[in-house]
């Protein structure tokens, strides 16, 4: 079962990452679905729970693979909504959220293993760490932000807030993460 702070982070994750029920190309041109779930191949697409547009008829593996091929050949750099087409397979919210929760729970476990004392941190700090791990990847966060990790381990929220800025994301998202570290003393 997910920790309460993991569940509390879900709406923020959807806000920052966006949420799209069909395949689209992310900013790097990778086929993606729901909240930033990269689908690396047509074969990988076949294992996803996808439905025809009405949401009641499950797609065949052939339909899933064909949809992946269709979207992978489209022009990248557009809004995710522009990749939907008549009859495109969709992911139901219950299935997409189950995938999201599984990913967040795995990141939470990885953070607990990678940051000594993580379990005892304030929930707001854990949410900021989840956001960074979701955005950067667990390894990218743990290895790419050593000064921030040091400040977290030391219980220095202000120091962590000063170190948590990421390039390439919105100022609003960076400010939200910093505010989480500033909001509660360890």
Feature-to-residue mapping (PLM):
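Acidic, aromatic-lined catalytic clefts of primarily extracellular/periplasmic carbohydrate-active enzymes
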Residues: 1-127, 151-186
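Short, solvent-exposed secondary-structure capping/transition elements
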Residues: 42-45, 138-145
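Charged, low-complexity intrinsically disordered segments
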Residues: 119-136, 142-143
